[in-house]
Amino acid sequence: MSEHKGPTGAMVDPESLPYRPCVGLMVLNKAGLVWAGRRIVIPGDEMDGATQLWQMPQGGIDKGEDPAQAALRELYEETGMTSVSLLEEASDWINYDLPPHLMGLALKGKYRGQTQKWFAYRFEGDESEIAINPPPGGHTAEFDCWEWKPMADLPNLIVPFKRKVYEQVVATFRHLAA
């Protein structure tokens, strides 16, 4: 990777930046479809300029927080869902790098990308508990709408630089949709 300008105009060497530790959540309904939300684009974030805005819930792991706890916290903060049961935890962490034009800008300019631990859950509740805009607890809305999507469609709905992550996640959890 080559250097890129950060938010202050200084050159940023992506190799010198860490990955942000995060969790990702695949939530399946009883029909085997996956919950996906359409991201609200914030200027300067990693989705700025994207047209493929559908994604599964994800978010950062707080310092000292267990990834499984972070997954349930993020799911609630972004969707309001609490009626879920754990199906599976992916064995490996999956990394992605930001594209060059976002390096040093997105993710507050502090990270080269994310390293994600993925979890699959079954949604056991009533869809009336899903609340995205506004989400519960005074959290900022990240999605403007949501749908249940076929798992195989997910890689083509996400922003291109996260596509390989979604391909790996779908391959890992494909057997759960059957």
Swiss-Prot record:
GO molecular function annotation: bis(5'-adenosyl)-pentaphosphatase activity; guanosine-3',5'-bis(diphosphate) 3'-diphosphatase activity
Motif (Nudix box): 59-80
CDD domains: NUDIX_Ap4A_hydrolase_plant_like
Every Nudix hydrolase domain range: 18-171
GO terms classed as biological process: nucleoside phosphate metabolic process; ribose phosphate metabolic process
Signal peptide interval: none
SUPFAM superfamilies: Nudix
Cofactor(s) the protein needs: a divalent metal cation
Classification via InterPro entries: Nudix_hydrolase (IPR020476), NUDIX_hydrolase-like_dom_sf (IPR015797), NUDIX_hydrolase_CS (IPR020084), NUDIX_hydrolase_dom (IPR000086), RppH (IPR022927)
PROSITE patterns the UniProt entry points to: NUDIX, NUDIX_BOX
Domain of life: Bacteria
Coiled coil: none
Keywords for the protein's UniProt record, in alphabetical order: Hydrolase
EC number of this enzyme: 3.6.1.-
HAMAP family in UniProt: Nudix_RppH (MF_00298)
Family statement drawn from the similarity comment of this UniProt entry: Belongs to the Nudix hydrolase family. RppH subfamily.
Summary of the function given for this chain in its UniProt record: Accelerates the degradation of transcripts by removing pyrophosphate from the 5'-end of triphosphorylated RNA, leading to a more labile monophosphorylated state that can stimulate subsequent ribonuclease cleavage.
Protein's name according to its UniProt entry: RNA pyrophosphohydrolase
Species this chain originates from: Brucella abortus (strain 2308)
